[in-house]
């Protein structure tokens, strides 16, 4: 301990008296003085000191106002904040399907075709529905009262008919999308195609994501009253992953070169394997419900010729009675009685048809009486056997 204290006593402690000795040890060409003097002189100039002393003390305590914000310079693309990722929801806007003839009297028409099994495309005026096969030609006629302006286009778009499916986009099923049936113009996911027109343009809407096909409007040829466009439907209505048995509508619109609407019309479509059979079945079901055919406004009826099928009208017209008599040979008494009663009933019905409404009651009572006589005539008599214990 004594040796350590003696060593410390040899060196004087650092204090203000030792600062002068340390200052003398610095080299003569000191670089610190040349680098620090100019800034010190600038910060403590005589004018600044005088202004600072003459300044109002209250003003010195005030907080300086914030400088006015300058106009922000255009940020570089790399420094811009990334926009939030936009999702791809279902389309929010649903195209209108209401008929609109416009100033040019725009209407649709279809060729006449029956309900035979061999037909590939048939139109039902009562249902306003087109039945067609997959990828088969469907002629649609465009009728106008006056010629539209140059640059007019015709757009075809498919939407779902029911309200719960209207917001979804109609597209082909994955199986048919992979089929090698492309014509080089139509995208594989588009349902409707135009046949035989190289000027067809297939569009995908940016806002609604719906598919449509647009062709330039061509006036009718010489000797023709309408313009015909041949459409193809490239997926069945029953395909899983596509329409999936959901009914669809095809909306045909007439637009000018700027996209303004000039006319609109629509019809239902069913793509199936047997159009004639399906049309006949749906028309029968429609008539069984007792619903009348929807009356379209004047000028909007589809130009389809009436069908000549036997079931086209629920009530057949009565033919006038023929006065000629016929002789029918019938084998067997029972069968003869049945035909005789039927003939008498028909004769009575014809006789009472032009009389008062009470004739129907007399007709029914007459039939009951005749039926009772005929049945009692052929019934075997039933006898009660009397035994020894009977009364």
Curated annotation (Swiss-Prot):
Motif mapping: Bipartite nuclear localization signal: 302-319
Chain positions covered by the region annotation Required for interaction with ZNF385A: 97-297
Modification N6-acetyllysine, positions: 117, 302, 319, 371, 379-380
Biased composition, class Basic and acidic residues, residue ranges: 280-292, 349-358
Modified positions (Symmetric dimethylarginine) in chain numbering: 333, 335
GO cellular component: centrosome; cytoplasm; endoplasmic reticulum; mitochondrial matrix; mitochondrion; nucleolus; nucleus; PML body
Span list, region Disordered: 60-92, 280-319, 349-391
Main location: cytoplasm
Cross-link (Glycyl lysine isopeptide (Lys-Gly) (interchain with G-Cter in ubiquitin)): 24, 288-289, 349, 355
Motif [KR]-[STA]-K motif positions after renumbering to this chain: 368-370
GO terms, biological process: cellular senescence; circadian behavior; DNA damage response; entrainment of circadian clock by photoperiod; negative regulation of cell growth; negative regulation of DNA-templated transcription; nucleotide-excision repair; oligodendrocyte apoptotic process
InterPro entries (UniProt xref): p53-like_TF_DNA-bd_sf, p53/RUNT-type_TF_DNA-bd_sf, p53_DNA-bd, p53_tetramer_sf, p53_tetrameristn, p53_transactivation_domain, p53_tumour_suppressor
Region (Interaction with WWOX): 63-107
Family: Belongs to the p53 family.
Protein name: Cellular tumor antigen p53
Gene that encodes it: TP53
């Amino acid at each position: 301990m004594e040796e350590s204290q003696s060593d410390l006593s040899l060196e004087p402690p650092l204090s203000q008296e030792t600062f002068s000795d340390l200052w003398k040890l610095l080299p003569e060409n000191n670089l610190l003085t040349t680098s620090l003097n100019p800034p010190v002189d600038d910060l403590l100039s005589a004018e600044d000191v005088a202004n600072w002393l003459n300044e109002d003390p209250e003003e010195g305590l005030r907080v300086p106002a914030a400088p006015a914000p300058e106009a922000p310079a255009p940020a570089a693309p790399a420094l811009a904040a990334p926009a939030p990722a936009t999702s791809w929801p279902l389309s929010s806007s649903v195209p209108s399907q209401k008929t609109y003839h416009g100033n040019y009297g725009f209407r649709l028409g279809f060729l006449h075709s029956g309900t035979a099994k061999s037909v590939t495309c048939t139109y039902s005026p009562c249902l306003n529905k087109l039945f067609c096969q997959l990828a088969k030609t469907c002629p649609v006629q465009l009728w106008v009262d006056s010629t539209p302006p140059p640059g007019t286009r015709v757009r075809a778009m498919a939407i779902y008919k029911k309200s719960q499916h209207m917001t979804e986009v109609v597209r082909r099923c994955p199986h048919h999308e992979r089929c090698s049936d492309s014509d080089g113009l139509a995208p594989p996911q588009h349902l409707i195609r135009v046949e035989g027109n190289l000027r067809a343009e297939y569009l995908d809407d940016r806002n609604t994501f719906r598919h449509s096909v647009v062709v330039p409007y061509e006036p009718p040829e010489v000797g023709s009253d309408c313009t015909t466009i041949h459409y193809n439907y490239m997926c069945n209505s029953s395909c899983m992953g596509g329409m999936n048995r959901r009914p669809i509508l095809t909306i045909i619109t007439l637009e000018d070169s700027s996209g303004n609407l000039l006319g609109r019309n629509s019809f239902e479509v069913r793509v199936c394997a047997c159009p004639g059979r399906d049309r006949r079945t749906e028309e029968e079901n429609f008539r069984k419900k007792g619903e009348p055919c929807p009356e379209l406004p004047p000028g909007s009826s589809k130009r389809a010729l009436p069908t000549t099928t036997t079931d086209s009208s629920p009530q057949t017209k009565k033919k006038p009675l023929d006065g000629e008599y016929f002789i029918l040979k019938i084998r067997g008494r029972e069968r003869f009685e049945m035909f005789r009663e039927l003939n008498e009933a028909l004769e009575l019905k014809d006789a009472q048809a032009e009389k008062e409404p009470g004739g129907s009651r007399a007709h029914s009572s007459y039939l009951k009486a005749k039926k009772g006589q005929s049945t009692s005539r052929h019934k075997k008599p039933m006898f009660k056997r009397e035994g020894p214990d009977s009364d």
